[in-house]
């Protein structure tokens, strides 16, 4: 697995909902995002109860499900895009459990996925999932929020792989309530100075530069998915707008 050190060029991770509006669009969009400067892609696995996501991504999940999304769609998209862009699956445990988590990890590895982001796996119950990920050379991405105590941070930070998903506040994606992060960032850096910290939840084209100051990268989801949901736009216009947003954010966090 690729090894990351402290980063000089700040990274951009983009979240998009898989197969919305369809597989072919997602494949084309992912490849276009790579060309627009996106470093990693969170490929969202549609689920009916996405507890960590705000109303924008929740709506996108439901739309994709209504259009008949299946895990086979996820596999076909991933196979096409993973050679061109670092690909992570972001999903909830239920769809993966239906297949079997061991089988999910094996499939992810075979398709070139680099990591899994599963918000509803409590840290206390994550050991068997971590083991399966390790066996398949996948990173199980860890979340750290301002609400975590020092002892929990001291446990999570040393075992994190690929990057730590730094939660900007305790809540759902796409909302705006924030917590002061500098003390938390300093605490994590003291424990594991090599692991990149990527800030997510509430990052958009207006605030990305400010939010990225103390971290190694940002994760942008709702700001992009909002464009996916805009029924006034054609698919071509959606792709152009999303890629322009991504390019603008990547430039702003590195300016």
UniProtKB/Swiss-Prot annotation:
It comes from the Bacteria. Its EC number is 4.2.1.20. It holds the Pfam family Trp_syntA. GO terms for molecular function: tryptophan synthase activity. Signal peptide: none annotated. The active site is at residues 42, 53. Pathway: Amino-acid biosynthesis; L-tryptophan biosynthesis; L-tryptophan from chorismate: step 5/5. Keywords: Amino-acid biosynthesis, Aromatic amino acid biosynthesis, Lyase, Tryptophan biosynthesis. It is an enzyme of class 4 (lyase). NCBIfam families: trpA. Belongs to the TrpA family. Tetramer of two alpha and two beta chains. The alpha subunit is responsible for the aldol cleavage of indoleglycerol phosphate to indole and glyceraldehyde 3-phosphate. This is Tryptophan synthase alpha chain. It comes from Wolinella succinogenes (strain ATCC 29543 / DSM 1740 / CCUG 13145 / JCM 31913 / LMG 7466 / NCTC 11488 / FDC 602W). The gene is trpA.
């Amino acid at each position: 697995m690729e090894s990351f050190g402290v980063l000089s060029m700040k990274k951009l991770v983009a979240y998009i909902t898989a197969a919305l509006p369809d597989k072919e669009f997602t494949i084309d969009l992912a490849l276009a995002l790579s060309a627009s400067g996106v470093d990693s892609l969170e490929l969202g696995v549609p689920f009916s109860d996405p507890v960590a996501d705000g109303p924008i991504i929740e709506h996108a999940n439901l739309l994709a499900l209504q259009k008949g999304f299946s895990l086979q769609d996820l596999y076909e998209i991933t196979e096409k895009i993973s050679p061109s862009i670092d690909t992570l699956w972001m999903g909830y445990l239920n769809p993966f459990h239906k297949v079997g988590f061991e089988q999910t990890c094996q499939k992810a590895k075979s398709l070139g996925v680099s990591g899994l982001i599963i918000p509803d796996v409590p840290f206390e119950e994550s050991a068997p999932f971590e083991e399966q990920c390790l066996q398949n050379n996948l990173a199980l991405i860890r979340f750290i929020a301002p609400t975590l105590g020092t002892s929990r941070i001291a446990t999570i930070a040393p075992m994190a792989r690929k990057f730590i998903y730094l939660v900007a506040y305790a809540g759902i994606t796409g909302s705006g309530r924030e917590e002061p992060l500098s003390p938390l960032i300093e605490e994590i850096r003291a424990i594991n100075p090599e692991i990149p910290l990527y800030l997510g939840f509430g990052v958009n084209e207006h605030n990305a530069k400010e939010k990225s100051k103390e971290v190694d990268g940002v994760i942008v989801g709702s700001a992009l998915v909002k464009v996916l949901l805009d029924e006034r736009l054609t698919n071509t216009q959606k792709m152009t707008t999303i890629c322009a947003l991504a390019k603008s954010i990547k430039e702003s966090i590195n300016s």
